[in-house]
From Swiss-Prot:
Transmembrane segments: none
The C2 domain, residue ranges: 35-152
Function text: Component of the signaling pathway of IL-1 and Toll-like receptors. Inhibits cell activation by microbial products. Connects the ubiquitin pathway to autophagy by functioning as a ubiquitin-ATG8 family adapter and thus mediating autophagic clearance of ubiquitin conjugates. The TOLLIP-dependent selective autophagy pathway plays an important role in clearance of cytotoxic polyQ proteins aggregates. In a complex with TOM1, recruits ubiquitin-conjugated proteins onto early endosomes. Binds to phosphatidylinositol 3-phosphate (PtdIns(3)P).
Domain CUE, first and last residues per copy: 230-273
Protein name (database record): Toll-interacting protein
One Pfam family in the UniProt entry: C2
Matching InterPro entries: C2_dom, C2_domain_sf, CUE, TOLIP_CUE, Tollip_C2, UBA-like_sf
GO terms for cellular component: early endosome
Gene transcribed to yield this protein: tollip
Record note on domains: Both ATG8-interaction motifs (AIM1 and AIM2) are required for the association with ATG8 family proteins. The N-terminal TOM1-binding domain (residues 1-53) is a disordered domain that partially folds when bound to the GAT domain of TOM1.
Keyword RNA-binding attributed: no
Main localization of the protein described in the UniProt heading: cytoplasm
Length: 275
């Protein structure tokens, strides 16, 4: 029971302090901002959705129907799979025949069987202009270990399937049950002024109110599958065997087969037969 005693300066309150003493209760808006930030970070790494596997997409090149604008276009690709967005580097002066040879590693959430690909022309003094797009269904054969090398039709202003074609090489690696990619422990900076802060790694803008102390997000330790390294000797040997295939395409196939050289040769033979 609390008691009071008298001193020269007045009465002093003695006893147990309440648990919420000097604590600022966050408003509903502040709590929602914090929950949104955590959800965005989980979605960035597929933590809340789980992962059924990893899709490797090699964006090789495109043959476009038209060069939009007065100068040669600087195209780049944007891939949307689930909640994640990936981009290739810009093919400067690529015009109608840009080449990227960019390998994109995508985590595939459960229930996702396709992805959306867009090609943009990078502009210096205005918004980037979308040139073409396509909707790609992930082939069922990928889950059986095969590699798909296909040309996909592009659509936009010229009409459906009339904007040219894009060459994609895809492979799929199954992820064992219970394994998923998650971010490391992230400690948010303490902000005491109204403003906009950026969450490390995820890069999601979040507003903090005065007195609000953001909380860290501890992540459960997970075990990630390790792939066999792709040696330069194996890569060079397969490149000599398949001189018509791009070096990055061969590297992607070796990584998809987890360093198994015989399986990679079978996949590459299948690709050359389809060409």
């Amino acid at each position: 029971m609390a008691t009071t005693i008298s001193t020269q300066r007045g009465q002093v309150y003695i006893g147990e302090l309440p648990q919420d003493f000097l604590r600022i209760t966050p408003t509903q808006q502040q709590q929602q901002v914090q929950l949104d930030a955590q959800a965005a970070q989980q979605l960035q790494y597929g933590g809340s959705l789980g992962t059924v596997g990893r899709l490797s997409i090699t964006v090789v090149q495109a043959k476009l129907a038209k060069n939009y604008g007065m100068t040669r276009m600087d195209p780049y690709c944007r891939v949307r799979l689930g909640y994640a967005v990936y981009e290739t580097p810009t093919a400067h002066n690529g015009a109608k025949n840009p080449r990227w040879n960019k390998v994109i590693q995508c985590t595939v959430p459960p229930g996702v069987g396709s992805f959306y690909l867009e090609i943009f022309d990078e502009r210096a003094f205005s918004m980037d202009d979308r040139i073409a797009w396509t909707h790609v269904t992930i082939p069922e054969g990928l889950r059986e270990g095969s590699v798909v090398d296909e040309w996909y039709s592009l659509s936009d202003r010229q009409g459906d399937d009339k904007e040219g074609m894009i060459n994609l090489v895809m492979s799929f690696a199954n992820m064992p049950a219970g394994m998923h990619m998650s971010p490391p422990v992230v400690l948010m900076p303490t902000v005491y002024q109204q403003g906009v802060g950026y969450i490390p790694i995820a890069g999601v803008p979040t507003a903090y109110s005065p007195g609000m102390v953001p909380m860290g997000m501890p992540a459960a330790p997970t075990v990630t599958p390790q792939e066999a390294p792709c040696s330069e000797e194996d890569l060079k040997a397969l490149q000599d065997m398949f001189p018509n295939l791009d070096r990055e395409v061969i590297r992607t196939v070796i990584e998809a087969q987890q360093g198994n050289k015989d399986a990679a040769i079978n996949s590459l033979l299948q690709m050359t037969e389809e060409l």
